[in-house]
Amino acid sequence: MNDKQKKPQKLKARLPRGFVDRTAGDIRAVNEMTAKIREVYEHYGFDPLETPQFEYTDALGKFLPDSDRPNEGVFSLQDDDEQWMSLRYDLTAPLARHVAENFNEIQLPYRTYRAGYVFRNEKPGPGRFRQFMQFDADTVGAPGVQADAEMCMMMADTLEALGIKRGDYVVRVNNRKVLDGVLEAIGLGGDDKAGQRLNVLRAIDKLDKFGPEGVALLLGPGRKDESGDFTKGAGLDQAQIDKVLFFVGIKDYAESASRLAELVAGTSKGAEGVEELNFIGTLVASAGYGADRIKIDPSIVRGLEYYTGPVYEAELSFDVTNEKGEKVVFGSVGGGGRYDGLVSRFMGQPVPATGFSIGVSRLMTALKNLGKLGASEVIEPVLVTVMDGDVEAMGRYQKMTQDLRAAGIRAEMFQGNWKKFGNQLKYADRRGCPVAIIQGGDERATGVVQIKDLIEGKRLSGEIEDNASWREARVAQETVPEADLVAKVREILAAQAEDRKRAGGDV
């Protein structure tokens, strides 16, 4: 075996598919956004909660029927006691487990918010990741729809706190009970029609994708897509299809409310659902939220299979350019509704709950499109350079660094190979450091430091043509007593901030 064969192979650095690294800019942008969301939730009287990223798989409801192995939608492993655990799929199922497990200690109504990563073991694609952040708020133990109305108002306030103007968003509200009433009215009530009702729900969930014509085919005989694949329909007749499409096609609720009430009159839940929608409309209007902010809209159909009452969705109405270069409406950034059954499956008794979830990554994309994120400037640290490596000199450099930090100024002492001073200035330039502190043996002997304004120096370097003039001018560099270090650095940073404001047209 030759030496080449003996040489161990390098491990290839690679990121798992569907996952991303988050850099400083992304992390700061998310922190800035979530801080504003958190402030709104706190004002509404909600408290934070954190649950583990792992839950027992059955708590997430992710076992296939007649199977002892979790389905493919979750990342799972077996504990040493052979119980299956999975990374959480959303933040709602862990909340339900927490409430059920601590029910006797929790004060109802329980108002909580959570932010954290969720995981989907699904095929990744453009903009589709296996790990992403959600920010949820929920009220558990509040049966009245006033809790749902409050959620809608909180969603609207959150979007405005993030800088999204009225007219650029709307929170749309529907009610699962009304749809149940419509389905009952067309003959799809009863347990024996559960499968057909599910097919109807799945068909109308495609309204945004296929439009009314495509949904009509899915409600009726079926639909063939462009590739020739056929999807079997729900088997409704034309009269049934027309009533379903009337419901999901309502654009002006006030104009259609009486006809809708007539359609669901006599059904077990439909009339109750219409009454709840009207109640929500009255509550939000009384609180000053007009239809430009919160709108009753039966065309909201996403998630109706999951929710048991009101369902709501926050949509952004401004245009963005998609990956094909087309102008499209940005669309949904969050939604939720009433899910009275989720906690109840642990308890064996009814536990009403309502809440919503914000897709943090998607909302961050929207805010970047609007120029509402990342505006908070982050100043890179002042660099204290190292001219000498003896203990006394290092002690002086470290003290300067700590003095700057104690004054609230970001600062770092150079930790690389200090013997090549040019590399220190290159590091400062690439890092974007605003100021460099320099003290050699001569300066240390006289108790002074050199302070170099790197931003001004970079600007002036374009105006001085030869090295001799540059050295003579000692561009943007001052010598001050060590005792004046902090004050002088603060003065330079303030001047740089003023320059940035002028450049941005703020003054």
Swiss-Prot record:
PROSITE patterns: AA_TRNA_LIGASE_II. Its main location: cytoplasm. The keyword Cell inner membrane does not apply. GO terms for molecular function: ATP binding; histidine-tRNA ligase activity. Keywords: Aminoacyl-tRNA synthetase, ATP-binding, Cytoplasm, Ligase, Nucleotide-binding, Protein biosynthesis. The keyword Aminoacyl-tRNA synthetase applies. Coiled coil: none annotated. Homodimer. This is Histidine--tRNA ligase. It comes from Rhizobium leguminosarum bv. trifolii (strain WSM2304).
